[in-house]
């Protein structure tokens, strides 16, 4: 049995979108322990994911906080991960790669950087949908994908029937139209129409 690391920070929507990729990684590593490096808002939520052995907290402090980086890298190295799936694909996680596995290719560190299609720039590649990018990344990394393009986030649900009954909420529907304040292009403009 070996240890596998998945990295996913981001927003709740990012976590939901990555659920299919995480399930595919788990299905392809049935005898391994899967750990996910994520942030405090999603720590407890990700602990409920049946495909994850445990969650490792990344406080995402400044890269200039050398003490924090040293402690995080020391902690990660203790797990002796044989494979890392970087589903965040950010400058921060690329920086982590350069510290943990500086010479690793997709056989050790799976990311956009290590699986980019030949002759394609990252800017052009990033124009594709995130689920298609995950699928490409995992396929190049030897993962058979069945769930990546149809993520199942049902593992995150809670039974709220008692709350609904107590407060007579059966006739209500709650929408949470959250989006990143700096990524306005990702905002879905049809919530008002949906409500009507």
Protein language model features and the residues they cover:
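Catalytic machinery of carbohydrate-active enzymes
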Residues: 1-196
